[in-house]
Regions:
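Conserved alpha/beta-domain cores
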Residues: 1-147, 153-155, 167
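Active-site loop ensemble at the mouth of alpha/beta enzyme cores that anchors a bound cofactor
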Residues: 173-175
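Active-site-proximal glycine-rich helix-loop-beta segment
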Residues: 156-158, 163
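Short glycine-rich donor-binding/catalytic loop of glycosyltransferases
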Residues: 164, 171
Length: 175
């Protein structure tokens, strides 16, 4: 959130910003209306806060529901088993549009090791689509990063995160 708030005023206004990291509820007010898509909604409480802030600004906020497909304790995201229920609950919020799912697969040496996870989330996306839930559009399947994006695309990814491949390793130390 801080990075968006710092860089957005300095860069061209036609850039379409996405919120891709973990989002805390107390930071929601700073990004609603400033980003095209929030990739990391994994609780109803977070979605509810996004909806509250979106109503205040009279905007609709597109989101992706983050699924922890590999059940990794170190990562955020709802379990695949609970994802459909969460999608159904969030779908009732007036100022949110569920545009799809996002997952971050485990870091592996061999990208093939993540194929099963990518298949599982693709199937979850199909299952949600087949439920025909109002206000839910499974248009985006965001999965795959620099090391495994080719396998993710083969398994149905419509969006990949390849920043390291383009920009190199990030330095997260504050200067």
């Amino acid at each position: 959130v801080q990075e968006i708030l710092t860089k957005k005023p300095e860069l061209p206004q036609d850039i379409r910003w996405h919120m891709i990291g973990h989002l805390q509820r107390n930071k929601v007010k700073y990004i609603v209306g400033k980003v095209e898509l929030i990739h990391s909604v994994d609780t109803y409480r977070l979605a509810e806060e996004i909806n509250i802030q979106a109503k205040k600004q009279n905007v609709i906020v597109p989101i992706l529901v983050e699924v922890n497909i590999a059940h990794e304790e170190s990562k955020f995201g709802i379990s695949a088993e609970d994802a459909i229920l969460l999608v159904e609950e969030i779908s009732k919020l007036e100022n949110i549009r569920i545009k799809g799912l996002m997952t971050i697969a485990p870091y592996v040496e061999n990208p093939e090791d993540n194929r099963l996870y990518f298949r599982k989330i693709k199937q979850l996306s199909v299952d949600i689509t087949n439920k025909n839930i109002d206000n839910v559009f499974m248009e985006i399947l965001s999965m795959g990063m620099t090391g495994d994006y080719m396998v993710a695309i083969e398994e149905g990814a419509t969006m990949v995160r390849v920043g390291t491949g383009i920009f190199g390793e990030r330095n997260y130390k504050q200067e």
